[in-house]
Every structure is written in structure tokens, then in C-alpha cells.
Amino acid sequence: MVNPSPTPTAPPLPVVETIVKATTFVWQERNEFLTLAFPAILVLSILNTVVALMLAGDSPQDLATDAERLEAAVQAGILPFLLLIVPFAYFWTTFAIAWHRKYLLPKDQPSIGEVLTWRSRHTRFLLQAIGLTIVAVVILLVGASLAAFAPVLLVLVLAAVVSVYGRLSQVLPSAAVDHGLSFAQSWALTRGQTARLFATIAATWFPTAVAVSLAQQILALILGDSGSFMALFVRAFVGNVLGYLAVAIGVSVLSLIYDHLRIGRTPSVDMQVF
């Protein structure tokens, strides 16, 4: 494996430019996005709809006893998670790796079959993503216990989560292109860039999350409370389209950061939009 070493002369990460170029890249490659994401969006939307219909029942508020309400809440929340976590993890991993490689290895032109074939890089990528999630959860739990005494600390906790994620996240694009960075190497690679990583990731995550949430709220108003197959499918389909667009933007940001840090220059993306 080829391990890119930290570049002492790497210039500071350009925050705004990185975000703009990531968004531009997704727009430029919108046809490729549809090709790569459509299988995941379609399959997950069907599964979401089927699971929702299978588990449809009375609202927890309409049930008589606390035990019934608890059982209904578990059924409505935990069971869908357990049923969908494996296909979600599979499609998220295969798409994220394909999108990382789309930017970092532009000459690589895999077929859909090759994109969906699980390889050792997928296992490494998924395990490191799980590791990042565990680190974030631990920081949140520890921070939340401290914030109980001083609520203002919650802001610092969230900042710490984003900062640590930024420092460690370079294992993901590295795994996607078989460079094999460890968490320690990612931490070393991002030395001196913490504030800019925080600004870049925070300015990507939060507006994207707000936009997706608003779009879903608008969709819910349009479709109402209908529990029909078509209404559930449309809701799931649009939600998955928005979700994978958010993934594509986030992955593009990490790829641009990795490209910038590993070669010590500003990543170059043709800014032509059309």
C-alpha cells in the first residue's frame, strides 16, 4: 500500500473554495451521480416502503397502556433500523467509495457491477467509518454529561466532535483508493489544519442537514399522512435522493481535502458548470 506522508509545505486548506468546488463537482458529474446512486436509491426506497407497511399499526399515543406504547415505539424505531441497517451500510459504502474514486481516480471507469462488488477496500472503509462513529459518540456522551452542569459546554462538545472527525476522516478517502492510512496517519496528515477542517466540514454538514430537513418537511406537507404504498414510496424515494446528494457533497469535500493535503497544493477542479 502507498501511504502518502504529511506535506509540511502544504498551504492552508481553502475553506470556501473547497466547499464551492465540491458542490460544483457534484453538479458537473450529475449524470454519473444518477448512474451510481440510482440502484441504491431505488432498492432502499422499496425496502423502506415495504418495512413501513409491514410495521404499520396504531400510533403510540392511541394505545392504552405504557407497555403498549413502549412496544409500539420500539417497533416503529428499532425494528426498521435492524431490518435496514445491512442494505443501508452496503449501498452507502459502495456509493461513497465509488464517489471518492470518481474524484481521486478520474481515469477509473468501473461498471455498475464493479461498483457494487464488495472488496477488501469496502470492508476497511466501513470499519473505519464505524470507528469514526464510535469516536464521535464517545465524545458526545462524555461531553453531554459535562454539559449537564454547564449547558454552554454543549457547543464546545459539538465543535470537538467536528474537529476530531475532520482530523481522523482522511482514512476514508485513503481507504477508497487503497492507500491505507491509519487513524494516526490521518491525524498527522491534518496537523496544522484543524480550524480550517472544522470550518469546512461544519459549513458543509449543517447547511446540508437544514436543506434536507426543510425539503422533507415540505414533502410531508404535500403528501399529508397518507399511508398508501405510493405515498410512502415517494416519501422514501425523495428522502433517499436528498440523502445521497448530501453524501456526494460530503464525500467530495473529503476527497478535495485529501487531494490538497497529500500533494500539498490546492485541488484543481474545472469550474465550468455546464
Where does each model-flagged region fall?
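C-terminal TM-helix exit segments that contain a strictly Trp-centered aromatic cap at the helix terminus
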Residues: L47-L55, L140-A144, T208-L219
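N-terminal topogenic module of multi-pass integral membrane proteins
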Residues: L42-S45, T49-L53, G57-P60, V74, ...
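Short hydrophobic membrane-inserting alpha-helices and related fusion/pore-forming segments
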Residues: L141-L156
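Residue-level signature of transmembrane alpha-helical entry/exit and packing/kink sites
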Residues: F33, A37, G77-F81, I85, ...
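Interfacial aromatic "cap" segments that immediately flank transmembrane helices
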Residues: P6, A10-I46, E114-V138, S163-V212, ...
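Solvent-exposed, amphipathic alpha-helical "stalk/arm" or coiled-coil-like segments used as scaffolds
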Residues: L84, F88-I97, S120, R124-Q128, ...
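Short, positively charged
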Residues: A73-V74, A160-V162
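Juxtamembrane transition segments at transmembrane-helix termini in multipass membrane proteins
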Residues: V2-S5, D58-G77, P87-Q109, R167-H179, ...
